[in-house]
A protein has these predicted regions:
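Extreme N-terminal starter segment of soluble prokaryotic enzymes
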Residues: 1-3
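Structural motif
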Residues: 5-11, 52-57, 76-80
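A short, well-structured beta->alpha microelement
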Residues: 21-44
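Ser/Thr/Gly-rich flexible loops in soluble cytosolic domains mediating phosphotransfer, phosphorylation
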Residues: 62-101
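N-terminal pre-core extensions flanking Radical SAM catalytic domains
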Residues: 85-152, 169-173, 347-408, 418-420, ...
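Conserved alpha-helical substructure of the radical SAM core
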Residues: 108-229, 240-256, 263, 286, ...
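Conserved C-terminal portion of the radical SAM core fold
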Residues: 173-181, 200-207, 226-234, 252-400, ...
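A short acidic/small-residue loop/turn micro-motif
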Residues: 436-439
Length: 517
């Protein structure tokens, strides 16, 4: 019998020794010939058995798409060989780990099983998420001009509660990471400290996005104790633009807290998150230097989410492609000088270079006021109330919307639909935070999270990905554009991909009703 071992050097000898010494494993064979993986092997047909360690599983699948069809495919895990087709064994190991409160082993097994489900393209999965984005509060002390709080304030806002924590206890043993933000400022949550302590008791690493307007000594303690990353929202490096974008916040207070975070939490990774818009496009390189000065490891620039309610289409810097190209290139160069990573969306053509057109675009940008007058904001709020009523946003069932036709090609599957859901404080579950208007289900409507995790909508989403089709709600996805998705790619997307698709049933019905008038 010929066996191919695909493993790290340290595991190769362990696996070979295991095979040679554990006679029961190949008791029916006279001899076993072991080979180690080399790039020259392009055809696996000559091997009767393949052994892959946990660290090379994903690479093996990338190299050999059909590897999961092998009857004799084994996983080297925790010092033993496990037949990949024997799903019950890993499940049993997981149950024992949870019972023993061995959280690290439970998480490790769950992650392996997630990979195996993905490799075997299972639409129905028996694993829990390894990451969870869970809203801590939907209250916010700011009214940023690109956010629903701009027109809705804290209408309909909720705070974390014990009922929610109890309902999610089913997931906690398996989670590696909890992302503690949603549509509010997490450091205003009344149960922030208690939530952190609960998550930490299960060995869960934490991260969150904050506007950094609040940073108490207790926050500092919790960040150092339990957080692997802090992501800070900041869209300008001057007082006028910062306070114009992030209404109700103080630039001086932000700088003070950024210094405290830098000096008192030196070992925690820090990321600055900035939304690209007309108002800040001229200071992008300065923002990179600003982020570096205050101890950030990375600055991520994201595209503006255009809102029909706010009417901010002209704030989108895609309207100013030559200036965007110039400023983004300067920002990247500044990152190299300052030693900070700069991440930008892939939707911009950085080859554009024309100073005359840049000047014309700057004139257009400054021909409109950067910020609205109070009476204009009140008019937006009145319009929003006429559209969404008492809620701060419209939430629809994804199953009622339009996202399964005329789709772009893709390779792989988005991790959000197999290991990383987003849950708000109503208990509504969404595919991701970008699509937080389209509900897949509600945790309080199901006895077990796994029942929701495998409802008809989730199965349809996974099946589309496995068939090489990108669901319609993924068009112009920020995670695809900034390259943060590890298991999904959209090769050579057309220009149409960079336009957000209107999948909303409410939007379709609204347009039809107005067309009839």
């Amino acid at each position: 019998m010929k066996v191919l071992i695909i493993a790290d050097i340290g595991n190769r000898l362990k696996i070979e020794k295991y095979i040679s010494s554990y006679k029961k494993f190949f008791h029916y064979l006279d001899s076993v010939e072991v080979s180690f993986f080399e790039k020259k092997y392009t055809d696996l047909a000559e091997f009767d058995c393949i052994v892959v360690d946990e660290y090379n599983l994903n690479e093996a699948v990338c190299l050999y798409r059909g590897i999961y069809n092998y009857d004799n495919l084994f996983l080297w895990f925790e010092g033993a060989l496990i037949c990949v087709s024997d799903a019950d064994l890993l499940k049993s190991m997981s149950n024992k780990a949870v019972k023993a409160k061995n959280w690290s082993l439970a998480k490790k097994i769950n992650s392996i099983r997630i990979d195996l489900n993905r490799i075997m393209k299972k639409a129905v999965i028996d694993t829990y998420p390894s990451q969870l984005q869970l809203e801590s509060t939907s209250f916010c002390n700011a009214q940023c001009i690109m956010c629903s709080h701009y027109y809705a304030g804290n209408k309909g806002a909720l705070d974390m509660n014990q009922r929610m924590l109890d309902k999610l206890s089913e997931l906690l043993p398996y989670l590696d990471i909890v992302i503690m933000h949603g549509n509010g400022e997490p450091f205003t949550s009344k149960l922030f400290s208690e939530s952190v302590e609960v998550y930490s008791s299960y060995g869960i690493g934490l991260t969150t996005n904050t506007n950094l307007s609040i940073l108490t000594d207790d926050h500092i303690r919790l960040i150092n104790q339990s957080f692997v990353n802090i992501r800070v929202s900041c869209d300008a490096c001057t007082r006028e633009i910062y306070e114009g974008i992030r209404r109700r916040l103080s630039f001086d207070n932000f700088v003070k807290n950024a210094i405290r975070l830098r000096d008192l939490c030196p070992d925690v990774s820090k990321t600055m998150a900035s939304v690209l818009m007309r108002q800040n496009i001229e200071q992008l390189p300065e923002m990179v230097a600003f982020a570096a000065e205050y101890g950030f490891d990375e600055i991520i620039f994201s595209n503006l989410g255009v809102s029909l309610i706010v009417g901010n289409e002209k704030d989108n810097i895609s309207n100013y492609p030559y200036l965007a190209s110039k400023q983004l290139k300067k920002a990247i160069d500044m990152g190299s000088k300052c030693g900070i990573k700069v991440t930008i969306p892939s939707s911009f053509d950085l080859s554009l270079d024309d100073e005359l057109i840049c000047g014309e675009e700057i004139e257009i940008i400054h021909s409109m006021p950067f910020f609205r007058r109070e009476e204009e904001i009140l008019a937006i709020r009145d319009f929003a109330e006429s559209v969404v009523g008492d809620e701060y946003r419209i939430v629809e069932n994804l199953s009622d919307c339009f996202w399964e036709e005329n789709l772009f090609e893709c390779e792989g599957i988005c991790e959000w639909c197999i290991e990383k859901p987003y849950i708000d404080l109503n208990g509504d579950v969404f595919v991701c935070c970008i699509n937080a208007s389209y509900r897949v289900g509600n945790i309080f409507d199901y006895d077990s999270f796994l029942d929701l995790w495998n409802n008809d909508t989730y199965k349809r989403i996974r099946t589309l990905f496995y068939n090489g089709k990108l669901p319609g709600f993924c068009d112009n996805c920020q995670f695809i554009l900034n390259g943060s998705l590890k298991k999904l790619s959209v090769p050579s997307p057309s220009k149409d991909f960079y336009q957000r698709r209107h999948i909303s049933k409410f939007y379709h019905d609204y347009c039809e009703a107005n067309a009839d008038e």
